[in-house]
Amino acid sequence: MTATPATGPRTATFLLRQPRQVQGFREQLRSDDEVFVEGVFVEGVFDQGGVFAEEQKKTALTMLWIPPGRFWMGSPEEELDRQDLEGPQHLVQLQGFFMGQMPITQAQWRKVAAWVEQPGEQWGCELKSNPAWFDGEKVKIWKSSGSASDESVVLDGSANTDLHPVEQVSWHGAMEFCNRLSQRTGRHYTLPSEAQWEYACRAGSTTPFHVGATITPDLANYDATTTYGDGPKGEYREQTTPVGLFPANAWGLHDMHGSLWEWCLDHWHDSYEGAPSDGSAWLMPSASEEEPRLLRGGSWLDDPWYCRSAFRDRGRPGFANVYVGFRVVCLPQGPSLNP
């Protein structure tokens, strides 16, 4: 798709092929710009609503602006089945930042893992080409002989998992992904702090889930054979699902509940006693390399209780499993990243 030549700047509107991922966007174009829309977003283009993207096609990494603000981090004592490690609730003031609209996908991971180190770049640990367990050989797909009663779930090796979130990624692997992305783009990509993650997940909500007091299997991917509060039972999918399949929260982020546990920067602490109030990662200066790191969000494998906005877990930084993935944040460091 090529922008029609015109005199001076103008605004162009594009309808994207995947409206779940982006509802549509407007961008300022020069008269000689060529814009290629293939799936999600356009390389290096900034949107006036606080959205920007790297790459093209299925590997597009869409980053959403998370506005500055403050919130009560942790769960209140009256929250159903809350744990002491989710408190004490404390007020946190955060600066704005960009966060990935979706968890990192298998296609995005493969793209970055395949990059060849260029002069001036310094890669760290090796990245497997695709560590995910749920590839086309293992993802169940629906087959039908023509009537709904004859539908069944089968494994036939034909599933396309490009848009499934990448899993079996350790904290070290997630950080190396951010390192390569930062060096290649000149921007500061990293994992979110625990405070950034919960603030973005809640998106102004104060309930156990950003959707309310409970959650249902049409809103997230978790083990819905169990319930939280008054929530109904439902389907247990037993695997990952494509990113963006479920509704976004109020700030446009998808898959913050369930899907995959997501790594955060912070070292693990048993409570929030002494936690930072500025949204920064809570790190132990003298910690060993194997000190546990934070995990948030729950996964496809878990009961809904684990998927609450305030629930916390941890893992050794070398830990990788079929229920662990990540998403990235980008920190504003100059005028080009201001929304």
Residue ranges and their predicted role:
Residues 79-92, 213-215, 230-240, 256-339:
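Surface-exposed recognition segments
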